[in-house]
Design a protein with these regions (language model features):
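A sequence-level/structural motif corresponding to short, flexible coil/turn segments enriched
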Residues: 16-446
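Sec-dependent N-terminal signal peptides
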Residues: 4-13
Length: 446
């Protein structure tokens, strides 16, 4: 297997812009450069969606692949399968595993467990191969593996509609918690514990959907949250007090959503350890706004990362057609601060991490719409913003070429390096790719 390592000495490929002048004297040294880029995949679409650090000092990546050649030469099924990649502490690939059936299977989140095996989350439309059951369209799909990625068990959670899951975490009491969305109309109101009073008449085509299961896949509880329109959750955390925060987007203006701003809002909910709704908060305006990631701060406040097309409601300082939004919310659900991050162009964010000094690194993609003519391919670059906790930008870096390139997730390792993963489309000079479809990329920033 050939792994291409490229040191980016090509100045045209790396762009670094100082957005705001900052006194750097109190910050730890940062080289502020891309050290290397690796690409993986075959001749079809391959996408990395999430990354975690592993207990042996390496890292693991989950995503989905349609390839049956290249790095996925051993895959003997057409269509999309979940993949799990493991790397050592030198960023060298150790092994790859795929999981799926004959239909559409996607991997979006992962966590390493005390036995050093993995729990994977995504959604599956298959009922053959590794997927033993499917109840409709896509089902939430949980996969449990050993430390080498060998399948131990898998389980589907879903009903007749499209039910997707995006994030999974290990809870402090040793269980698993995952979230996504449920088509409540298709489930005819099913999808929650009987102790909850929500009825199917109160909910619509998509709801925030949360599950808690044990390490053998047995359901402990589940519940859905939202209104009569489309509501989807993308990320979650367990708080220091044992509750859960879920973030996503909501189109609803009724039921669990009390103060909507119109259009799609960033929607944040807090639920207790048994899944009961504690509070909810809408952030946005009359356009499309969505929450993508959440973290708890040492103060007990929460930072919500999202994207916004709005310039009204409680988002009033739009910079471009789409801005990254950073919101600080108290433990009681009160909005403390909302900050637009971006330029006069188009930026979206998918994930963020907090450095030990309190600064943030935010990854997503951007494009300069003003430089694109009708006959040109849209250039979406991987974008990395380095900011203070309040969202004030220190540096902006971008990486990419023509085509749709996106940074989907990132981790900050023990050596101070940032590892960014996502997808890279079309051939970029200086980077060896297998084809013009999306390939997995792993980029190191320091």
């Amino acid at each position: 297997m050939k792994i291409t390592l490229v040191f980016l000495s090509l100045i045209f490929f790396l762009r670094c812009d100082i957005i705001e002048e900052t006194n750097w004297s109190f910050l730890p040294p940062v080289k502020n450069e891309w050290e290397s880029v690796n690409t993986f995949g075959g001749s079809e679409e391959d996408i990395a969606n999430a990354i975690i650090l592993t207990k042996d000092g390496g890292f693991a990546i989950i995503g989905n692949t349609k390839s049956t050649d290249g790095d996925f030469y051993f895959k003997n099924r057409e269509g999309s399968d979940v993949f799990l990649m493991k790397f050592n502490n030198l960023s060298e690939l150790q092994w790859i595993k795929t999981y799926g059936g004959s239909d559409d299977d996607r991997g979006h989140g992962l966590v390493q467990l005390p036995d050093e095996g993995y729990a994977l989350i995504g959604y599956s439309k298959s009922n053959d191969g590794d997927a033993s059951e499917n109840k409709g369209q896509h089902d939430n799909w949980v996969i449990r593996t050993d430390v080498k990625g060998e399948l131990l068990w898998e389980k589907s959670f879903g009903f007749l509609g499209h039910d997707h899951a995006y994030n999974i975490i290990k809870t402090n009491d040793g269980a698993l918690f995952f979230n996504g969305f449920l088509d409540v109309t298709a489930s005819n109101g099913l999808g929650q514990n009987k102790i909850f009073s929500n009825s199917s008449s109160r909910h619509g085509v998509g709801e925030f959907w949360a599950h808690k299961i044990d390490l053998e896949g047995n359901l402990l509880w589940r519940n859905y949250y939202g209104g009569t329109s489309n509501d989807r959750s993308y990320d979650s955390i367990e708080t220091s007090t044992g509750d859960f925060i879920l973030v996503g987007t909501s189109e609803s203006q009724d039921q669990d959503i009390k103060n909507p701003n119109g259009g799609y809002d960033i929607w944040v909910i807090k639920i207790d350890k048994n899944g009961k709704l504690i509070w909810e908060k809408s952030i946005g305006g009359t356009e499309y706004d969505s929450g993508t990631s959440v973290m708890e701060l040492p103060s007990g406040d929460f930072l919500i990362l999202g994207n916004s097309f709005s310039n009204n409601g409680n988002i009033l300082n739009a910079l471009g057609s789409s801005d990254i939004i950073l919101s600080k919310i108290s433990s009681n659900g009160e909005i403390k601060e909302i900050k637009n991050i971006g330029t006069t162009s188009f930026e979206t964010a998918n994930s963020f991490v907090r450095r030990p000094d309190g600064t943030l690194l935010i990854v997503g993609h951007s494009n300069n719409e003003s430089n694109i003519s009708d006959d040109q391919m849209i250039e979406n670059d991987i974008v990395l913003f380095y900011t203070f906790e309040n969202g004030a930008v220190i540096k902006k870096n971008s990486l990419g070429n023509l085509g749709f390139d996106s940074g989907n997730d990132l981790v900050h390792d023990h050596n101070g390096r940032l590892i960014v993963v996502g997808s890279m489309e079309n051939i970029s000079e200086g980077i060896v790719k297998r084809d013009s479809n999306k390939n997995i990329f792993i980029a190191i920033w320091h």
